[in-house]
Amino acid sequence: MTQMVKNELAKKVLIPLLVLSLLAAMVGVLTRTDFVRAEEAPQLPKFDIPALSSEHKTSSLPNVIVVATGGTLAGKARDDDPTNFQNYAAGTYLMSDLVAQLPKKDKIADVSTFQFGNKGSGGYTIKELYDLSLAVDAALEIYDSAVVTTGTDTMEEISYFLDLTVRSEKPVVVTGAMRPWDVIGTDGPANLYQAIKVAGSGKTKWFGTVVMLNDVIYAAREVTKTNAHRNDTFDAPMFGALGYVDDPAVRIYRAPARATKAGTPAWASPFDLKTISKDSLPIVEIVYAYQEAGGGSIRGLVEDGAKGIVTAGTGAGGISSKQSAARSAAIKDKGVVFVSTTRTGSGSIYDSGSGNVIGGDNLNAAHARMMLLLSLAFTNDVNTIRGWFTTFGTQDVEISVDENTVLSTSVEEPVVTEPVITEPTPEAVLPTATVPPTEPAVTEPTPEATAVTP
């Protein structure tokens, strides 16, 4: 084979191989770039939310979806004992079966169900709450309002997480039960029915998430469980109820501060979960203050990876000297953000305006933890977090009315028509002469006409 032939063969073989290698390298780079981009974009979960039925589409009733997570409401008494109030398996019954048992529900709403999960409230992780919030928003793209059923143990935390993250302004009503579904005197069916009624009424639109048990409606930010067993366990210290369900009416007597911002950008929470991955949700813990409390709990939690810590302090948020020293070290060495709350159950802790310790206002420790956890998922800037706590995290009401705004009553006064009185004109009035009274005429008989009787 001559050298010329060898050169021609090399050109025909090697050049295509070089081109293919170059193309492969380019494809590899593009593939890696796309992979990085895909990793940067959060992988959002998908939910099999039921579509509206054709019957519900044409119905005049509100359509309500019940998003079920389990809890005592869906619990089954053990040994089939209807008097077994405390020994039961939470999250046993399916919500579709429970809703089917509600009498006359078709008089108040068209009800559908979505079974998100079926376990006790304390069994859910923060990542699962991330999914739950997105599921509720997905459901509200179809339905007028949503009821979320959960266990009562951590209901105040789950409901406040939803309040802080659900993007829709439509009503979200959280409910549950203190007694399992199949025992005598269970509160489950009534709570479920009344929650559907509240959601269907539309009266809590723009309120954020509310909690309804025992016929009482509370703001998610304010509500807390106060008793381990009683049916009326939920309360809102300092604030009280938003309203009540008094058959057949749903009565709302006050609104949360957030509702005053309805229809404005300020209404929306800063925590849009669609923009972050669930893996970015940080570890945030709670430390309880007590007499001569040590600092080991703070040091241990920081070592375990906590990015934020809420202290439930004595009185107006006080912590022990050892806890204070551990807190200072955590801030200096790790940049941990702290929120100060009170263990008393009510009262406000005001913010100093600087540093890594933020006043929790009147949030309880469990609520403040959710607020801090979400804040740290979106920023590491403590001043931004402080701003969120002192604005969206408070219930401080500010009402401002544009000076050019004209307020008018919605009551229309009836038009009053005055009677028309026609006065005589001066020209038409003639003076009347005074005529002296005349004596009545008396006819005297004439002599000739007088009859004489002999």
Predicted regions located by residue number:
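Accessory alpha-helical/coil subdomains and C-terminal extensions
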Residues: 61, 67, 77, 94-105, ...
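Short Gly/Thr/Asp-enriched flexible loops that form oxyanion-binding sites at enzyme active sites
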Residues: 149-170, 320-328
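Sec-dependent signal peptide cleavage junction
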Residues: 26-40
